[in-house]
Amino acid sequence: MPQVDPELFDRGQFQAELALKASPIAAFKKAIRQAREVLDARFRAGRDIRRLIEDRAWFVDNILQKAWDQFDWSEDADIALVAVGGYGRGELHPYSDIDLLILLDSADHEIFRDSIERFLTLLWDIGLEVGQSVRSVDECAEEARADLTVVTNLMESRTICGPERLRQRMLDVTSTAHMWPSKDFFLAKRAEQKARHHKYNDTEYNLEPNVKGSPGGLRDIQTILWVARRQYGTLNLRALAGEGFLVESENALLASSQEFLWKVRYALHMLAGRSEDRLLFDHQRTIAGLLGFEGDDAKQAVENFMQQYFRVVMSIAQLSDLIIQHFEEVILAPEDEAPPQPINSRFQLHDGYIEARNDNVFRRTPFAMLEIFVLMAQQPEIKGVRADTIRLLRENRHLIDDNFRNDIRNTSLFIELFKCKIGIHRNLRRMNRYGILGRYLPEFGFIVGQMQHDLFHIYTVDAHTLNLIKHLRKLQYTQVSEKFPLAAKLMAKLPKPELIYMAGLYHDIGKGRHGDHSEIGAVDAEAFCQRHQLPVWDSRLIVWLVQNHLVMSTTAQRKDLSDPQVIHDFALAVGDETRLDYLYVLTVADINATNPTLWNSWRASLLRQLYTETKRALRRGLENPVDREEQIRQTQSAALDILVRGGTDPDDVEQLWAQLGDDYFLRHTAGDVAWHTDAILQQPADGGPLVLIKETTQREFEGGTQIFIYAPDQHDFFAVTVAAMDQLNLNIHDARVITSSSQFTLDTYIVLDTDGDSIGDNPVRVKQIRDGLTEALRNPADYPTIIQRRVPRQLKHFAFAPQVTIHNDAQRPVTVLELTAPDRPGLLARVGGIFLEFDLSLQNAKIATLGERVEDVFFITDAHNQPLSDPLLCSRLQDAIVEQLSVNQEPDIKLSRISI
């Protein structure tokens, strides 16, 4: 800390200002304000961050000393002002808590009570954020014995004012000789760290990470130092290196990583104007600029900054694992430790952990750097890797070069890992954590720490990839197979399950390289297969899966699965049932590994329907596609049979059906046709809109709640309907809009509640929805189609230009309008209003919300029920949608192509 820094705090000038004023508060506030401005300016100028946070602690020391001197403490008084916690370490960020201990010799505080209260009141009045406790030495011992946090804070202490002897006595009575021996302290801190990591989903890669508490954050470094201090006395990172826990290169890496996080934390506090350790979207872009990160645009700069952030915290997590493992071996070593058990000539088992038998194993036999992970997968009883061996792996990974990558021993070992019955994910994750995976597969190294700046992808690309492999492995577990029955069944019967793991490893490997990542990844996957000498059939399947890993989810979410042509085209693209099985399992794992909130009952039912219909088409033969007329006849025959058995007059049925048109029978099952028909025929002529709600278990709509609406057609009907559903907190996932020849609308919506589940059989909720829709649709002209709602905080930070693509469907007489736009409350109602303005009819819609963006597909016709044919009209329509959805967006809106 500096001894003198007049720019930051001029003691003489401050003393003079105190003397001039009746109250000291103004002088203190002025000094604090000026110091903050000086330090912030130094930060913006790029001053050394370690010096900055030490300078702030030095400044606060001076302020506290001056405040302490305002009160009458006798020179030999048994009272001291002690800095504890982070402030005790001499580290203070702009709005960090200033933790103080007012330490007394005796538990009798009465003699000092008035002065202590007035001192603390002064600190609050001048604007210092202090956390204070008033304790005697004995009370410190009592509190510390019962509370891990208290003893930890007291270990990091400095005397600011008063006699140092009190703090020394306090340190003595709270030492390992009296409480918290190093073994107990280590076990408690390790458990505390595990609980903290679990709070942050056990990943360094949260979208809005906590710089202090997340895995790989500043708290992990502090945990290392706390354990070391309890075991060895006063230590810092350099002293840890001296004790053999760190080599010099690791010490330098840990120190530079700590300084990077300090910069981020300092910037967070400065920008937020308060204590803030969450790296929120609100601040990521600004901090990227402050720290000098650049890119082709602001989004790229943020992604570059966050990639650096994630690589830094991953380095900290790696070294934290290494040091904690080292502590465990030293602190928890049993007195009667059993001798190591040989595994082979290169490795042995030491207290349940694998270790190299000598320091030259990896240098002399580099293939052992892959063999160690295969051994752990083959022998799951191995707990992990000894600390010295982790260090040897890190020190020798530079030996992984092109010769290593092409050595048949190494390629064979890597493939062997994928054939192990268990441990694939765990050991790939270890390989990534120790820096081996990215060296062996340089293309994988490129995606390490690569974040996509959106709400859809909540993990970095490497974390998502390993997560996908984890999901594939979990399909073997009973509790998981119950949630994903079809995927688990198919996974169990895949002829070569190792191939889906390899495809999973490569499916997103092409991201971040400015092109179609599926195509780029397929090229990399093919090179991988050739280098590892995989058979032709295996190679072709892996490459095909990587190239087409998005096709199934895209088809399920964006195409009309009731259209036989859609199923036929998808079946043609897949080709055979084996590929279909692999693709379905990969797709399920991919969605769940991308973002847990993406998987819901509706998305599951869409994929299952597409799988089942495609399998049926493949078994029937691609040369024999389903005939539309035959499908209509089958649906009508089955529905009529249900109705007649229920006592409905066939003549009434035929009369109604004659008004509905072919599309209605193509889009609905026989059961739904019978359900709708029966309700419509019983509806009084002046009974108002008919609203039916069903928790359906039919294959086509399984997992969603079906809402069927029958009412006289009006121009603004769709806009009002979706606005009313928005007010009812319903998420629309599918819309099927049909107008009968008698000008009645027959609309079917598949909805989920906001939690992603179907409505269920809750009669109160069903009645609320039915009544709300009926009331809104009784007088559509009186219902506001656009209802203002607050945009969620996170969505505000992902503005991008809406994109609209318009083209005519090759198989059906409709125009397809594809919309990609930022998700906003009331978006569908706004689109419906534009369709109304342009005199367009909506025939069908597929609605998908992916994080902060919507990817919706609308099937529309003109006023004459024909596809759009006027390019000028399409251009105006496109401009209107972009303009309407760009309110409060960035001005550089790009229009997408139009093809008619």
From Swiss-Prot:
Annotated region (Uridylyl-removing), positions in chain: 343-705
Superkingdom, natural source: Bacteria
InterPro entries for this protein: ACT-like_dom_sf, ACT_dom, HD/PDEase_dom, HD_domain, NT_sf, PII_UdlTrfase/GS_AdlTrfase, Polymerase_NTP_transf_dom, UTase/UR
Entry keywords, A to Z: Hydrolase, Magnesium, Multifunctional enzyme, Nucleotidyltransferase, Repeat, Transferase
Required cofactor names: Mg(2+)
Residue stretches making up the ACT domain: 706-789, 816-900
Enzyme Commission number(s) from the entry: 2.7.7.59, 3.1.4.-
A GO MF label: phosphoric diester hydrolase activity
Catalytic activity: [protein-PII]-L-tyrosine + UTP = [protein-PII]-uridylyl-L-tyrosine + diphosphate; [protein-PII]-uridylyl-L-tyrosine + H2O = [protein-PII]-L-tyrosine + UMP + H(+)
Span of domain HD: 461-583
Activity regulation information from UniProt: Uridylyltransferase (UTase) activity is inhibited by glutamine, while glutamine activates uridylyl-removing (UR) activity.
Region (Uridylyltransferase): 1-342
CDD domains: ACT_ACR-UUR-like_2 (cd04899), ACT_UUR-like_1 (cd04900), HDc (cd00077), NT_GlnE_GlnD_like (cd05401)
GO biological process, any: regulation of nitrogen utilization
Domain notes from UniProt: Has four distinct domains: an N-terminal nucleotidyltransferase (NT) domain responsible for UTase activity, a central HD domain that encodes UR activity, and two C-terminal ACT domains that seem to have a role in glutamine sensing.
PANTHER family from the UniProt entry: BIFUNCTIONAL URIDYLYLTRANSFERASE/URIDYLYL-REMOVING ENZYME, BIFUNCTIONAL URIDYLYLTRANSFERASE_URIDYLYL-REMOVING ENZYME
NCBIfam families named in the record: PRK00275.1, UTase_glnD
Function statement: Modifies, by uridylylation and deuridylylation, the PII regulatory proteins (GlnB and homologs), in response to the nitrogen status of the cell that GlnD senses through the glutamine level. Under low glutamine levels, catalyzes the conversion of the PII proteins and UTP to PII-UMP and PPi, while under higher glutamine levels, GlnD hydrolyzes PII-UMP to PII and UMP (deuridylylation). Thus, controls uridylylation state and activity of the PII proteins, and plays an important role in the regulation of nitrogen assimilation and metabolism.
Name of this protein: Bifunctional uridylyltransferase/uridylyl-removing enzyme
Organism of this sequence: Pseudomonas fluorescens (strain Pf0-1)
